Structure formats: structure tokens, C-alpha cells
């Protein structure tokens, strides 16, 4: 049961937020192995050619899954962190804007990509990642998360846009 490895930090990063910390899964080798195995099982009915992980915790689950499934890993980074030619996509945060980037040569036309991250809340970050993959000519096979916070609407937003989503765990609240 992975849920017991998720640490909840009240009032972080601001009052009223219950932060779901998955680093406690990553800190435990058995829990991390189980997380990767469950992720692979969760998506075994879906065909994809590559795994894209969103900066930063999406890199951890994404690279573990990539290793297990013997598929390429594509890092989707915060703006200004990739050394080669990139495209970027902006998205709205609670207090401003941010951007994600991906190398222009990381996805080829028609590549089916599974996008992964640790958690989905409002869906702004992962929606930007979906746009990046599509702009490069890739197809989004789905978006997977360790945790979803359904009350914040991110999963609904993706599903309304026709993107398949799956999560290992679901928590109420913010």
C-alpha cells in the first residue's frame, strides 16, 4: 500500500494546503520499486513509445518506468535548463506564470508518449506538457500520476480534452 508512504505536510507551501510529499516513496527502495511496478501495471493496456517526465519529481518516476519498460525517457524541463534547441509552453500558476521546455529533437512525428508526474492538482503544468508533445508532432498516449487531487479539477480538464489519465492514489482536499 503506497498511501502509507506519502507524507502529508499541513500548510505548505501556504496556509490551508495539505502538501502530499512523495519523496518518502522515493526514499524507500521497496516502496519506490512497488510504485514503478504499479505504474507499469496501470498502463499495460496502453501502447506508447516513450515516457516524458515533468521537472522535477516526474523525472524520478519517469526514469524508473523508462528503465523497467526499456523505453526512451524525455525530460520536460523548466525554462532555461535544456542546452539544445527547445520549444516552450507557458502556463498559469496561482501567483504568476511559468514555462516548460523540451528539446526539439526529443520527439519524432507520431511518437506515442506517456507523460508522467508525481501529482496532478489543477492540471496547468501537465496541460503545458501535453501541448509541447503535440507541437512536436507526437501523440499523447496518456498522462499518469502517483497522486491525483480530484477536487482541484486537473483530471477532469485533461479528460474533457480527450487525454486519458490514470493515477495510483487519490487524496481529497488541496
Regions found by a protein language model. Give the residues of each.
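PRPP-associated nucleotide enzymes
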Residues: 1-174
Amino acid at each position: 500500500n503506497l498511501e502509507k508512504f506519502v507524507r502529508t505536510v499541513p500548510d505548505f507551501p501556504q496556509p490551508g494546503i495539505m502538501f502530499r510529499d512523495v519523496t518518502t516513496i522515493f526514499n524507500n527502495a521497496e516502496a519506490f520499486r512497488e510504485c514503478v511496478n504499479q505504474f507499469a501495471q496501470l498502463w499495460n493496456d496502453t501502447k506508447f513509445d516513450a515516457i516524458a517526465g515533468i521537472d522535477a519529481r516526474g523525472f524520478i518516476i519517469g526514469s524508473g518506468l523508462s528503465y523497467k519498460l526499456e523505453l526512451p525517457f524525455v525530460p520536460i524541463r523548466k525554462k532555461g535548463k535544456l542546452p539544445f534547441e527547445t520549444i516552450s509552453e507557458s502556463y498559469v500558476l496561482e501567483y504568476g506564470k511559468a514555462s516548460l521546455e523540451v528539446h526539439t529533437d526529443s520527439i519524432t512525428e507520431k511518437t506515442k508518449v506517456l507523460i508522467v508526474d508525481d501529482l496532478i492538482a489543477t492540471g496547468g503544468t501537465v496541460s503545458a506538457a501535453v501541448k509541447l508533445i503535440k507541437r512536436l508532432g507526437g501523440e499523447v498516449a496518456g498522462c499518469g500520476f502517483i497522486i491525483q487531487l480530484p477536487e482541484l479539477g486537473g483530471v477532469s480538464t485533461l479528460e474533457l480534452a480527450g487525454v486519458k489519465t490514470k493515477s495510483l492514489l487519490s487524496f481529497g482536499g488541496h
